[in-house]
Regions:
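Generic structural motif
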Residues: 44, 137, 155, 168-170
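Short, surface-exposed, charged/polar-biased interaction segments
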Residues: 55-58, 120-121, 186
Length: 187
């Protein structure tokens, strides 16, 4: 493993606009893209609607499918029946179901990726700002290729957990493989 790469986040995004703003700042690097997925998981643990919107923005386009308008659009007056122009990309249902299942079983799981959090304290958050520690290794790949595997430090786990990010069409880095991030941690 390489020297740690530390990404600092002043606070958790409170809404989709704050998430997108932070993403435009952080996801210009592979580690920033990985942290955006961790923040989306944290948002999901707090608020399912916000979390789903953030997850859809944090994952690579190849991991999305066209779906009906999201629930928030419906609440804001969108037509109940989708039209071609209202069909929005959404996460693949199987991916979303697995994430929901894991997070609902351990809502503190996203906190395990924040420096200073420990199982002994019930994964209680430290004071903001929040710091995420990531590493690369000789198998991480070259970011110039548009694909990079990073390893996120995780309290309550045997070691860092891998996440693969890819540069998307808009040049931002987004997660394309994250299953190890949602595996249970020590209670």
């Amino acid at each position: 493993m390489t020297e740690p790469i530390i990404v600092e986040v002043a606070s958790f995004p409170a809404n989709a606009e704050e998430f997108e703003q932070l993403q435009s700042e952080l996801a210009v690097s592979p580690e920033g893209g990985a942290v955006m997925l961790l923040l989306a998981l944290e948002a999901l643990a707090r608020d399912e609607i916000l979390g789903e919107m953030c997850l859809t923005r944090a994952v690579h386009n190849a991991c999305l499918v066209k779906g009906p308008p999201n629930y928030v659009d419906y609440l804001n007056g969108s037509d109940l029946f989708p039209t071609v122009s209202s069909v929005q990309p959404t996460m693949r249902p199987g991916d979303l179901e697995i994430i929901y299942t894991q997070i609902s079983g351990q809502p503190y799981l996203p906190h395990a990726f924040i420096r200073g959090v420990h199982p002994d304290s019930g994964y209680r958050l430290p004071e903001a700002p929040y710091h995420f520690e990531l590493h690369t290794n000789i198998y991480s790949g070259d970011p110039d290729s548009g694909v990079c595997k990073l390893f996120a430090a995780c309290a309550g786990a045997a070691g860092p957990r891998p996440v693969t990010v890819r540069r998307d069409d808009d040049k931002l880095w987004r997660a394309s493989e994250w299953n190890s991030l949602i595996v249970s941690v020590a209670p």
